[in-house]
A protein has these predicted regions:
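Glycoside hydrolase catalytic-domain context in secreted enzymes
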Residues: 1-182
Length: 182
């Protein structure tokens, strides 16, 4: 990794607090069940609730397979656009993927994003899928290797990564309303 980038992406998104882990555990134990459940729900589309009693600020998430969207939908708030996950996987170059994902971490930090909702590790199962641009490959081993490099790159840059869509994320048609039968 280039030295200049290393300095930028290795700094944590939030400065370490120096809080002892025992203090964190004690604060979490002091929360009611309702407060704990609230920490798992969305405050809005792109953030989780703060819990001041536990010293937790609002947590911001964003989509990020090929660039960081951020909270705002404003064309003046641009983001670096990197190659799609499929293109990166085609290189089979884990070090390259890790470096590119460090750039995404930098973008996320610049936009105040704590966690990227990526990578998508669904496999390419059919050529008709409308979601392939988010996925790495039809090869499970390559997907695993590149997915790990993705997570290492993003989290090495001080931003969380959410591995998602393990299977059956293939449909673009009615994807917001499609529900699997029980």
């Amino acid at each position: 990794m280039d030295v200049a980038w290393e300095v930028i992406v290795t700094q944590p998104a939030v400065e370490p607090t120096g809080v002892d882990e025992r203090v964190v555990v004690a604060r979490a134990a002091a929360l009611s069940l309702e407060q704990k459940v609230r920490l798992l729900t969305g405050a809005d589309c792109w953030s989780l609730h703060a819990e001041p009693a536990a010293g937790l600020r609002r947590l911001v998430v964003s989509d990020g397979p090929a660039g960081v969207r951020g909270e705002r939908r404003d064309e003046r708030d641009t983001s670096a656009n990197v190659p799609s996950p499929t293109s990166l996987a085609a290189t089979s170059d884990e070090a390259l993927v890790e470096d590119v994902r460090c750039l995404l971490a930098f973008e996320a930090r610049r936009k105040g994003v704590d966690v990227l909702l990526a990578p998508t590790v669904n496999l390419h199962r059919t050529p008709y899928s409308g979601r392939h641009f988010e996925c790495f490959s039809e090869d499970p081993l390559l997907t695993a290797r590149i997915g790990v490099a993705f997570v290492r790159g993003v989290q090495g840059g001080g931003v969380g990564a959410t591995v998602k869509d393990f299977v059956a994320n293939d449909s673009e048609t009615q994807r917001m309303t499609l529900d699997a039968p029980r």
